[in-house]
Amino acid sequence: ENCVNGAKYEVAELLITPLTLGDSILSASEKRSGCALVDMGADTTTISIYSNNILRKLVVVPIGSHNATMDIAYCLKIDVEEAESLKVKYGRAWLEDYEGAQSKILKLSHGRETNEGRLCEIIEARYEEILHNVWAQIEEDSDKLTSGIIFTGGGAQIAALNEAFKQVNKRDKQIRIVKGMPADICMTSTTYIPDNGRTSNILSLLLHGDQNCVIYQTEAEKEANV
């Protein structure tokens, strides 16, 4: 707001990202019957609980998927970019077959190696912490969440997130992971936007920018409108 005002423009409206995200991702039925929307970002995880079409609870937990990346970098003694690449390509939030994963060798920089089991062990520990924090915010209202829990954001794209969350809450709650884009987004053939949930926030904000705030009027038009 300060930046916009400093540029001598007026703020038309301030949008709250969790609200715009809920409007673009959740169906009317989900909001009405009760659900939890969990936006797993890089540095924060936002939990929004809806019931009877009203946002009942909004909590931001200061931990996200980047923490798992930093754990990988620290434990395997590699660069953060390499750690992120390994997490995206091979990472799992829950590794059931640990013995089998141990035999899958992953190449690291400077001629070093690790195995998929070790990588996922690091990721699983951090995701367990994140999901425990999520469940701590949801548990009290869990019986009211008829439409279950909806995950979105870049951190929610990791494999086996469903299984990891079930290990945390020990309940048979309906879980949906948003991977596509909002239905109202239209693109040209030359425009590429990753269809993986990582852009959900910015796209939801764009969908709410439905007013032309840069219409130029001549002095004559301004006088005619008075």
Each language-model region and where it sits:
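Nucleotide/phosphate-binding catalytic cleft detector across ATP-hydrolyzing
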Residues: E1-C35, A93-S109, E113-L119, D141, ...
